[in-house]
Amino acid sequence: MAGPARWKLLTALWTIYLVWGSTYFAIKISVRTLPAFFSAGTRFLLAGALLALILAVTGRSMRISRRELLSSALLGISLLGLGVGGVTLAETRIDSSTAAMIAGTVPLQVIALRTLARERVALATRLSVFVGLAGLALVVLPGGDGSRSAVGLALAVGASISWSLGSFFGHRLPLPRDGFVATTWEMLGAGAFLVVLGVAGGELGTIDPAGFSLESVAAWLYLAVFGSLIAFTAYAWLLRNAPISKVVTHQYVNPLVAIILGAALLDEQLSLATGLGAALIIGSVFVAVRKEGAKPSAPDVLPASPQSIREDAPFERDAPRRSAAR
């Protein structure tokens, strides 16, 4: 039986490259006039509601046990609430390309967690972690141009740590077998969490629809529909139809896309040190995913996101749920 047409594979692959790579740019545009937690929370509520509608139309039940609901909510809060929500807040203070570079270290952080847990990790993979974290230091340390920048960098690093912890512990939780159902509940749980955070942080009093720019609203819709639904669907399809070694290439391509968009459309500048840091991060992630993706039984390294159906994907066992919501 012939496999899927090459054009389908390339279309799906470039969809996750470009869409997930552009989410950092879209977040930067959205928070120009939309409150950070409000925009992220409502985005996930909308995406979760649309996914629930799709499940209903296709006859798939969203009924799950209480344990699965609690696990889905906790994972959603870790990956999307604190992870993506933290990045969204960070981008009110730092460039989108900087946020993308920091988020790009998540696969390396998960490998570090696996090493600490005494899982078998190849020497080259472990060395790539040290190289990548050195790159992260170059990205973060030159950014001390005031307290706002320092706060933004700290938020982005904290968000990446939350995402890494969720990625590492996620497959140990009792989650629904259907990755789409799990993703739906994760989005809804994270959305509710972020809206509550926004209310507690006083965002409700700052919301003025008349002040929302068309660009910010369009970016918000793009994140909900393209970032969380269309790219998610392409990713889930790739996990079933493409070699995992090809699918995981998005982990080093996405930061590259984010850096290019930030420079071309937002006039974001990279210093020599930051550029070197970006090269070290992307290069080390390239080495890590190539080494891990080549192993038929390797544990998952990450996300995704995002966010999403990893029963048949040993390298990204829970990626569909994680990566979809970026």
What are these regions, as identified by a protein language model?
Residues 1-2, 43-44, 141, 216, ...:
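C-terminal-most transmembrane helix of multi-pass membrane proteins
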Residues 4-10, 33-37, 41, 64-70, ...:
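Juxtamembrane helix-entry segments on the extracytoplasmic side of multipass membrane proteins
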Residues 8-9, 33-82, 107-113, 162-166, ...:
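Transmembrane alpha-helices of multi-pass small-molecule transport proteins
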Residues 19, 23-26, 52-103, 138, ...:
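Specific transmembrane alpha-helical segments of multi-pass solute transporters/efflux pumps
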Residues 30, 39, 43, 90, ...:
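Hydrophobic/aromatic residues within transmembrane alpha-helices
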Residues 40-42, 80, 99-105, 169-192, ...:
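Helix-helix packing/entry segments at the starts of transmembrane helices
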Residues 51, 75, 105, 121-142, ...:
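Hydrophobic transmembrane alpha-helices of multi-pass small-molecule transport proteins
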Residues 51, 109-112, 116, 146-205, ...:
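Transmembrane alpha-helical segments that form core, pore/gating elements
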